[in-house]
Amino acid sequence: MEKIALITDSTSDVDKDMIEKYDIKVLPLRIIYKDKEYIDRVTISPREVYDNLHIEVPSTSLPSMGDMESLYEKLEAEGYTHVIGVTISSNLSGTYNSLKLVSEGHENIKSFIFDSRSITMGEGAIIKECGEMILQGKNFDYIVEKMPKMRENIKVYYIVDTLKYLIKGGRIGKVSGTVGQLLDIKPIISINEEGVYYTHCKAKGKKQAIKKLIEILRRTLSEKHCDIWVMHGGAYDEIDKLKDLVSGIENINNLNSGEISPVAGVHTGPGLLGVVIFKK
């Protein structure tokens, strides 16, 4: 009898209800200031990160190898036979490589560590789908076979108030970090097949950029039913309006919303608005 554990990292932004429903094991990333280290979503909140960015921009680090080893030892003790792990894009963090390395040292558990090539709720959408399959009684091999297709069907699009935090954190990818800053040109950022940020399109100002996001959604939903996530990072006054705009579009199976993790917020800065599309 298979006993499958689901592992992810804190950038997947799985909420408490999902964690409880699917018994997800979450490995937290770290946020490091000059005088103190915090555990993502555990000992620091997104708002605390944004409130302090004008004073200090912290660095971030992946979950510790010790945390990963301890988790695997606990899973073995609890009789788990299989692990499905879904991580943030390996082009944005070393989490995938570290978890894969740790998993290879535990031969009593058959593991499949999967690079989401995504971030935030794009990563979380894969975890949710795997969790549903486990609850339905699907076996390990069946779920693993379906995961690459899940990844193909997920797209992330977002806008930020400024690119300076992506540039500072070295996460700028293929997004131009100089063009249009003074002209208030906003890139609509997405993630390509390699899990690297790129500019999907551009708009003049945030208002027009939001319109572009809605256009992308309408175009996609006109062709296929989708699950949609609306996300924000420190855009507390704007997220409800965006969700209202999205909710009026047809062919949405499930509409979810949430705030990105503090670790992600370090690299985007306040003001992020975005959507995740999962074609079903």
Curated annotation (Swiss-Prot):
The record ties this protein, via Pfam families, to: DegV (PF02645)
Q: Which InterPro entries does the record match to this protein?
A: DegV (IPR003797), DegV_C (IPR043168), DegV_domain_contain (IPR050270)
PROSITE patterns (alphabetical): DEGV
| DegV domain ranges (all copies) | 4-279
Highest taxon, organism lineage:
Bacteria
Q: Which residues bind hexadecanoate?
A: T60, S93
Q: Keyword set for this entry?
A: Lipid-binding
Recorded GO molecular functions are: lipid binding
Query: Which PANTHER family does the entry mention?
Result: DEGV DOMAIN-CONTAINING PROTEIN DR_1986-RELATED, DEGV DOMAIN-CONTAINING PROTEIN YITS
Function (record text): May bind long-chain fatty acids, such as palmitate, and may play a role in lipid transport or fatty acid metabolism.
Name the NCBIfam families on file.
DegV
Protein name, as recorded: DegV domain-containing protein CA_C1624
Q: What is the lineage of its organism?
A: Bacteria, Bacillati, Bacillota, Clostridia, Eubacteriales
